[in-house]
Amino acid sequence: MAGHSHWAQIKHKKAKVDAQRGKLFSKLIREIIVATRLGGPNPEFNPRLRTAIEQAKKANMPWENIERAIKKGAGELEGEQFEEVIYEGYAPGGVAVMVLATTDNRNRTTSEVRHVFTKHGGNLGASGCVSYLFERKGYIEVPAKEVSEEELLEKAIEVGAEDVQPGEEVHIIYTVPEELYEVKENLEKLGVPIEKAQITWKPISTVQINDEETAQKVIKLLNALEELDDVQQVIANFEIPEEILQKVG
């Protein structure tokens, strides 16, 4: 397991311990607002919004909260004006990090992200400093306990997915960005349960971390970024051998 998929497995183990419902709701509401603003308020014609609503329902968000977020995104209700921002930087060990945020105050978010990088031994860089190490992809998570690797590979090929990366916690499917929602919905028609679907950045290659101290620092930095209210995704191009991961886990 490497890169994005590696971090996904670590995050899922952490999520079992940490259920921060209020923080999750805040992130989901922002995604609904932005999806509505970019693609309109009708989920039938806006697959990103449709997916955001599904995620909110899975998290047991009350319908009135979902409806209010859609109305804010459509300009029918007053509220914060959110924009999507991408930050780039380095974690310890030369690990490249991409941070995708949704914010109503770019200066505040930039300050918070920079503080986390600095505090944990990394550094926030200029736009373009690491993005060339990643490629934009559609990203789908499937719970590993519900679908076997063999079954998923067969169905992923059938619906035109680009790549499947099996894992202990989740299997990850990558697609061409423009085909993400089509692949997701075709998988669902074949009975595959989808835990998450989003546009993301996939590492082109990975940095191997071979010492426990650096591994611990990288994971602490990524966790701290994930916990910022404005941050929606954190992607990094690292790989940690299983024996070291068990020690720092």
From Swiss-Prot:
Record key words, sorted: Cytoplasm, DNA-binding, Transcription, Transcription regulation
An annotated Gene Ontology molecular function: DNA binding
Main location: cytoplasm
Disulfide bond entries: none
KW Glycoprotein (keyword) present: no
Record's subcellular location: Cytoplasm
GO annotation, cellular component aspect: cytosol
Matches recorded under Pfam families: TACO1_YebC_N (PF20772), Transcrip_reg (PF01709)
Coiled-coil ranges (or none): none
GO terms under biological process: regulation of DNA-templated transcription
Family under the similarity heading: Belongs to the TACO1 family.
Name of this protein: Probable transcriptional regulatory protein aq_1575
Protein species of origin: Aquifex aeolicus (strain VF5)
